[in-house]
Amino acid sequence: MSVIETATVPLAQQQADALLNVKDLRVTFSTPDGDVTAVNDLNFSLRAGETLGIVGESGSGKSQTAFALMGLLAANGRIGGSATFNGREILNLPERELNKLRAEQISMIFQDPMTSLNPYMRVGEQLMEVLMLHKNMSKAEAFEESVRMLDAVKMPEARKRMKMYPHEFSGGMRQRVMIAMALLCRPKLLIADEPTTALDVTVQAQIMTLLNELKREFNTAIIMITHDLGVVAGICDKVLVMYAGRTMEYGNARDVFYQPVHPYSIGLLNAVPRLDAEGETMLTIPGNPPNLLRLPKGCPFQPRCPHAMEICSSAPPLEEFTPGRLRACFKPGEELL
């Protein structure tokens, strides 16, 4: 099924054959000042070979969504709702089963590759360790497979690089190592948390192209967590726009980009710098994201919204206003454009 066809399929039907189904996901942290709800009743689904972009400002709950799915929440975190992977519930799995799942079927690329790699071990040893532990390969087999995967992520002189330490690599090269490590066990789902944040724009483009190629080659589903809408436009099939832990808008990437139906989505898109806007004032969203301990009454975006109305003091329901698209706003979508 193509991306365009997916956009017109009702969400219930999309969920029926999805690889990952997330329903009413809720993440709460206990703090000395009270409970903080970082993720509030999140719903989405993802098929094999699809890429979902989760976008929003810092503090919107993007990374905590990923950590919840990976079982990596901080000790003071609590999780609720449901997440099924290949029909199996994965939230609150026993540690042993969770480790097996993370190693073999779900992998994650973290934001800073330098802190994700062991500085005291050669890169090759770190790659081989994954295969020897989870695929029961011999040292020689693991070495050759690691070289093949480094070749797959376009690492120049892959065999030579196996003997090098992380500090001998550039930022872009280290990120390629992390992608190779994440794909060694051929996972069905790859979660990428701001994988290009610390990289220059040229390397960003190379990493995005690489992820697209690997998605096609291995039919891997990808969750791309980012605040960079340019990244989303280049790789994602579907987009989930988050604010204060909640879904503001969800749908096909083309629709969200060209026909956004939530003031927050429109604000994010308007804030993207344009090459043809020389001399024009850069647009921003006024104000700051809310304190999650003291959320405004009703819609959390209300204090910053240029279209706020009296009714916005009540929380807008998240509705499927057309097949495959969700929005949480009282203002009619056609009046926002």
Identify the role of each PLM range.
Residues 15-19, 28-41, 72-78, 94-97, ...:
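A short, flexible loop at the N-terminus of ABC-type nucleotide-binding domains that lies
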Residues 71-72, 188-195, 199-280:
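P-loop NTP-binding/switch modules centered on Walker-like glycine-rich loops
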Residues 76, 90-107, 125, 133, ...:
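ABC ATPase NBD coupling module
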Residues 79-89:
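Conserved ABC transporter NBD signature motif
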